[in-house]
């Protein structure tokens, strides 16, 4: 006799496992393109939840790099065969308007326990359009890739084994960034969380920064502040009977949003409920950082639509809208320690944060509303997509000159 509670726990475990494997596969793909020690690794763009230009269809991962065709990665570990085929039909049976030049799809799947694996492989090849090669990463191949990339073995896919693997990978990333000199730094977890190893490596190599020099309590000038918020969040929560569905939706949003920020060279500051706070130009101002912040905002719009789509498929009541809305501003911010003589936990304050929050409140779903000073830092070619707004009245701030950018909605209430 089956145990419904145990079955539900296994389903939720598989969801978390797939999210974790997505993170691992992103690092593997980046490693395959640039290795561990290339400061120019920002040339390899590894994006998650990419809108394929088909209603309700998002690629789990898209990998782009110079002089190579992009390719897709689909993490379908634990999916039933029929469900996996349905997803490939929706995503890859016809050309993608947004990624038309991709040349292959990597399917990350579990072979063990699938008596129909050969038939599944044949079905997926049949439903995938002919110009896309199909490659499989099963348990054995994934073990090889994890060992090649991180130098550690992929052990048991259990909660305990995965906790150990994550900690081992974080230790290795810290060494990639700083070498052996700072292995005992108390800032390891905090800085890896805020920046990711690639950005830390860049700061260490370009400026010689030690961990304690990266985010000291001080003023940072001309930082871009990005605030993103899930639309209709309260409605989604109200209509969700299973708390695990809500928690999984938020974890998916957090994981993908953090990846988008770090992948764009930004700093993930914090999550508050369904809101993301990210900074660009901290601790150093890089060429093109304002444009990368906007690119990150566009990625977050796609991530928000994808998360809302998945959430809608789990509940009965149809939600009128889904996605995110975003506010952005530029200005000085201050980093502040939460406790004396402790750099592990910091807060961010500044007028630019308050201004971005006011603009966020004015943004509709799938819109980015930006302050005029930030708008003027963008290349002229980017101005054409923006629409000037009427001056906005903001409490305790005054009238604000702002611009908005609307991106077509990818939110869909259809599909399973």
Task: Describe the residue ranges of each PLM region.
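Catalytic core of nucleotidyl cyclases, primarily class III adenylyl/guanylyl cyclases
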Residues: 263-292, 307-349, 403
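Intrinsically disordered, glycine/charged-rich C-terminal tails and inter-domain linkers
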Residues: 38-54, 65-69, 73, 126-133, ...
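Conserved catalytic cores of phosphodiester-cleaving nucleases, focusing on short active-site segments
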Residues: 17, 50-52, 57-95, 104-107
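Switch/connector loops and helix/strand junctions flanking conserved nucleotide-binding motifs
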Residues: 82-83, 114-121, 145-147, 334-338, ...
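Acidic-basic catalytic patches of nuclease active cores, encompassing PD-(D/E)XK
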Residues: 1-54
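Nucleic-acid nuclease catalytic cores
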Residues: 96-141, 375
């Amino acid at each position: 006799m089956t145990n419904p509670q145990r079955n539900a726990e296994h389903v939720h475990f598989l969801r978390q496992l797939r999210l974790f494997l997505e993170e691992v596969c992103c690092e593997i793909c980046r490693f395959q393109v640039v290795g561990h020690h290339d400061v120019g690794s920002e040339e390899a763009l590894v994006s998650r939840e990419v809108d394929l230009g088909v209603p309700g269809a998002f690629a789990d991962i898209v990998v782009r790099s110079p002089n190579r065709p992009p390719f897709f990665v689909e993490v379908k570990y634990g999916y039933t065969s029929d469900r996996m085929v349905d997803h490939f039909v929706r995503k890859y049976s016809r050309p993608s308007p947004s990624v038309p030049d991709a040349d292959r799809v990597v399917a990350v799947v579990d072979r063990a326990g699938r008596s129909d694996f050969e038939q599944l492989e044949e079905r997926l090849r049949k439903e995938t359009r002919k110009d896309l090669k199909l490659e499989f990463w099963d348990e054995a191949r994934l073990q090889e890739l994890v060992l090649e990339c991180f130098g550690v073995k992929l052990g048991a896919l259990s909660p305990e084994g995965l906790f150990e693997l994550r900690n081992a990978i974080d230790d290795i990333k810290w060494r990639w960034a700083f070498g052996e000199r700072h292995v005992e730094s108390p800032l390891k977890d905090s800085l890896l969380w805020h920046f990711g190893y690639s950005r830390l490596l860049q700061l260490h190599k370009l400026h010689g920064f030690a961990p304690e020099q990266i985010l000291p309590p001080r003023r940072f000038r001309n930082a871009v502040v990005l605030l993103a918020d899930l639309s209709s969040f309260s409605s989604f929560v109200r209509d969700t009977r299973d708390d695990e569905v809500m928690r999984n939706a938020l974890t998916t949003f957090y994981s993908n949003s953090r990846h988008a920020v770090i992948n764009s060279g930004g700093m993930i500051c914090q999550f508050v409920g369904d809101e993301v706070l990210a900074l660009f130009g901290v601790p150093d101002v890089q060429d093109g950082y304002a444009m990368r912040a906007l690119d990150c905002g566009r990625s977050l719009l796609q991530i928000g639509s994808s998360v809302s789509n998945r959430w809608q498929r789990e509940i009965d009541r149809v939600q009128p809208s889904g996605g995110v809305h975003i506010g952005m501003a530029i200005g000085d911010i201050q980093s502040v320690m939460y406790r004396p003589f402790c750099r592990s936990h910091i807060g961010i304050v500044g007028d630019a944060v308050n201004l971005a929050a006011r603009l966020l409140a004015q943004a509709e779903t799938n819109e980015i509303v930006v302050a005029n000073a930030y708008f003027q830092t963008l290349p002229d070619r980017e101005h054409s997509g923006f629409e000037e707004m009427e001056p906005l009245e903001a409490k305790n701030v005054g009238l604000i000159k702002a611009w908005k950018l609307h991106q077509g909605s990818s939110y869909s209430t259809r599909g399973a």
